[in-house]
From Swiss-Prot:
PROSITE patterns: GLYCO_HORMONE_BETA_1 (PS00261), GLYCO_HORMONE_BETA_2 (PS00689). GO terms for cellular component: cytoplasm; extracellular space. Keywords: Disulfide bond, Glycoprotein, Hormone, Secreted, Signal. Residues 1-20 form the signal peptide. CDD domains: GHB_like. Glycans are attached at residue 43. Indispensable for the control of thyroid structure and metabolism. This is Thyrotropin subunit beta. Belongs to the glycoprotein hormones subunit beta family. It is found in: Secreted.
């Protein structure tokens, strides 16, 4: 290997480790309401990935806000609305969900993000699914 090639490899690896990998990622969610007959499968995008972080020494001497870590969160997003099939007339069949347009590494904003990691898997259907999916166009 030449010295130039070797140096460019080392530089590439160093920059790759220093840069964050936080991007919109395809995500399939299942939505159902107990009053409705069907479960709806929605394809959307969410922010997922790795953000550079570090643990601080001297935690006892720092204020709590200085101890928070960056997470992969929304920079720009929009809401879309889907209709859950098989709902009776007295039930509103609409469900709004976020679609990530761009992402960033930053503090988790509870105004529009769920900042708690759930240990229980809840993304499944207990009712029959309709044969169509809402979301990505092919």
């Amino acid at each position: 290997m030449t010295a130039t090639f070797l140096m460019s490899m080392i530089f590439g690896l160093a920059c790759g480790q220093a840069m964050s990998f936080c991007i919109p990622t395809e995500y399939m969610m299942h939505v159902e309401r107990k009053e409705c007959a069907y479960c709806l499968t929605i394809n959307t995008t969410v922010c997922a990935g790795y953000c550079m972080t570090r643990d601080v020494n001297g935690k006892l001497f720092l204020p709590k806000y200085a101890l928070s870590q960056d997470v992969c969160t929304y920079r720009d997003f929009m809401y879309k609305t889907a209709e859950i099939p098989g709902c009776p007339r007295h039930v509103t069949p609409y469900f709004s969900y976020p679609v990530a347009i761009s992402c960033k590494c930053g503090k988790c904003n509870t105004d529009y993000s769920d900042c708690i990691h759930e240990a229980i898997k809840t993304n499944y259907c207990t009712k029959p699914q309709k044969s169509y999916m809402v979301g990505f166009s092919i």
